[in-house]
């Protein structure tokens, strides 16, 4: 289970970072500046979450002003199904890890017939 959440997690975060960087470039930032802004945002956010005992949803609400830019962006992310896509992707990774594990068990039985005893 951890593989689906943590083992493959860095790729999820990096994809999200890519999307943010690309959006920054679309807004007019150089790729270098957009990359640095996203890196600093990620670093600061992780530190903020690490230092707080509060749930991430509470922290998100604390940095979201009603009717503000963050609220607007989050509305569009939710409307676009971000949570559903992430949840389905992690479930698919979990299912894939089970399938790969089953394949490994079958290969081990072929290599070591005593494993069936």
Question: Residues of each region from the PLM?
Answer:
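NAD(P)-dependent Rossmann-like dehydrogenase/reductase catalytic/cofactor-binding core
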Residues: 35, 39-117
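Anionic-ligand binding region
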Residues: 1-36
